[in-house]
A protein has these predicted regions:
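Bacterial N-terminal signal peptides
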Residues: 18-29
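Bacterial N-terminal signal peptides that target proteins for export
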Residues: 3-20
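SH3-family beta-barrel domains
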Residues: 34-59, 73-77, 84-87, 94-99, ...
C-alpha cells in the first residue's frame, strides 16, 4: 500500500471516527428521555409529561395525522393533559376524564395547569400545610395555572391569587402515567395500571 493511499485511509478513518463520536454524543444527550416502551422520544423530553392546551378549540384525533378522524374537541384553554406518547408533530394525550387522543404539537404548551375534576371545591392554602390560612377555593370543573409541586403540595395561581393545594387533589400533578399509552385513541377512559 502506498503512503498516499495510507494517508487517504487514515484521513477517512479519522472522519468516520469523528462522525461516530458526534452520533454517540447525540444519542447520549437524549438517552434520558424515553417513551413508555423504552424508545427514545422525538423531542428528547420525558414521557409521560404534563402540558396544557393553548386554545379553547383543540381537535382530538384518532391517530397522529390530519387524515385521522376527529373524536371530539376540547374547549378549555389551559386544560392540563398528560403526554403519554409522541411523534415529531403529534402528542398522544390523556385528558382529565382519562380519554386518550392525539393532538397536534402546536396546540400544546409547556405551561402546566391543574384541573379540579371533582364536584367539591379544593382549598388553596397560604403555605404548604393544611393548617395554614385558606386564600381561595378552587371551584369544581375549573382550571388554574400550576407553578410547581413540592413535598406533596402544588403552588397554583389564578388572576392575583397564589397559594398551595394538596398534590393529589387535582388533575395535572401526578407523577405516574394516568392512561395506558398502549390504549387506542377514543377508547373508553380508564386509568393506567
Amino acid at each position: 500500500v502506498s503512503s498516499k493511499s495510507r494517508g487517504h485511509v487514515q484521513s477517512l478513518s479519522r472522519r468516520i471516527g469523528g462522525v461516530v463520536a458526534v452520533v454517540a454524543c447525540a444519542v447520549l444527550a437524549g438517552a434520558g428521555a424515553t417513551m413508555p416502551d423504552g424508545r427514545p422520544t422525538p423531542t428528547g423530553l420525558d414521557v409521560p409529561r404534563w402540558v396544557s392546551l393553548k386554545s379553547s378549540h383543540v381537535r382530538a384525533r384518532q391517530g397522529p395525522g390530519l387524515d385521522y378522524r376527529i373524536l371530539w374537541e376540547y374547549r378549555a384553554a389551559g386544560l392540563p393533559v398528560q403526554v403519554i406518547a409522541e411523534t415529531r408533530e403529534w402528542r398522544k394525550i390523556c385528558d382529565p376524564e382519562h380519554g386518550v387522543a392525539w393532538i397536534k404539537r402546536s396546540v400544546a404548551s409547556g405551561r402546566r395547569g391543574a384541573f379540579n375534576g371533582s364536584d367539591a371545591e379544593v382549598a388553596v392554602h397560604a403555605a404548604r400545610n393544611a393548617q395554614s390560612p385558606v386564600r381561595a377555593r378552587f371551584s369544581p370543573r375549573s382550571v388554574v395555572a400550576l407553578d410547581e409541586c413540592k413535598d406533596g403540595w402544588c403552588r397554583v395561581r389564578a388572576q392575583k391569587i397564589k397559594g398551595w393545594l394538596p398534590e393529589g387533589s387535582v388533575f395535572g400533578t401526578q407523577a405516574m402515567a394516568q392512561c395506558d399509552a398502549r390504549r387506542g385513541a377514543g377508547e373508553a377512559g380508564r386509568r393506567a395500571g
